Amino acid sequence: GYLGAPAVVAPGAPLAARAYAAPAYAAPLARYAAPVARAYAAPVARAYAPAVAAAPAAVEYDPHPQYSFAYNVQDAHTGDSKTQHESRDGDVVQGSYSLAEPDGSIRVVDYTADPVNGFNAVVHKEAGAHPAAAPVAVAAPVAHAPVAVAAPVRAYAAPLARAAYAAPIARASYGPALAYGGAYH
C-alpha cells in the first residue's frame, strides 16, 4: 500500500484503562525579609592649595640684533659653483648669492631688506668661467624585429560527468488511529 496512507487499527480486546493520581501541589513558601540597613560614610572633605602659576621665563630680547654668515662651494668634479653671504644690523639685512647656470654663466643676486623699503633684489649675469657642456648625442632608437606569435589553439573537452544520487528514501509517518475497535462512548 501507499506509505503515506493512515493506518486503520481494529484491536479485538478493549484497551486497558489507565489511572492517574490527582495532582498535588505544595503550599508556597512565603519568606519575607526586612531590608538591610546600609550605612554610608560622609564624603571626605579635602582642602587643596590653590595652583601657583609659574612665572613665564624671561625671553631674551635683543633690541639691535646682529649676525653675519657666508659659504662658498666649488666642486670641480660636478661643476657645482655657488656662494652666499648675508649680514644683519638691527632691522636691515643685506646679502648676495651666486650660482652657475647650465649655460656656463654665473647668476648673481644682491638683496636688501629693511622696514622702510621691504625686500629688494637685483639680479645680473656674468660671463661663465667655464663653457657649457656640449649636448650629448642621443642614440637612435633600436628597431626590434617583430615577434611571431602563434594563434591560440582552441580545444573543447566533453563536459564533466556529474555524480548521480539516488532519490530520497520514503519515510513512514505515524499518527493517531482513525478508529478503535469496540463500542465505547
UniProtKB/Swiss-Prot annotation:
One of its GO terms (molecular function) is structural constituent of cuticle. Keywords: Cuticle, Repeat. PROSITE patterns: CHIT_BIND_RR_1, CHIT_BIND_RR_2. The keyword Lipid biosynthesis does not apply. Sequence repeats lie at residues 21-24, 33-36, 41-44, 54-57, 133-136, 139-142, 150-153. InterPro entries: CHIT_BIND_RR_consensus (IPR031311), Insect_cuticle (IPR000618), Insect_Cuticle_Struc_Prot (IPR051217). GO terms for cellular component: extracellular matrix; extracellular space. The keyword Zinc-finger does not apply. Residues 64-134 form the Chitin-binding type R&R domain. PANTHER family: CCP84AA-RELATED (PTHR12236:SF94), STRUCTURAL CONTITUENT OF CUTICLE (PTHR12236). Component of the cuticle of migratory locust which contains more than 100 different structural proteins. The tetrapeptide (A-A-P-[AV]) repeats found throughout the protein are also present in many proteins constituting the protective envelope of other species. This is Cuticle protein 18.6, isoform A.
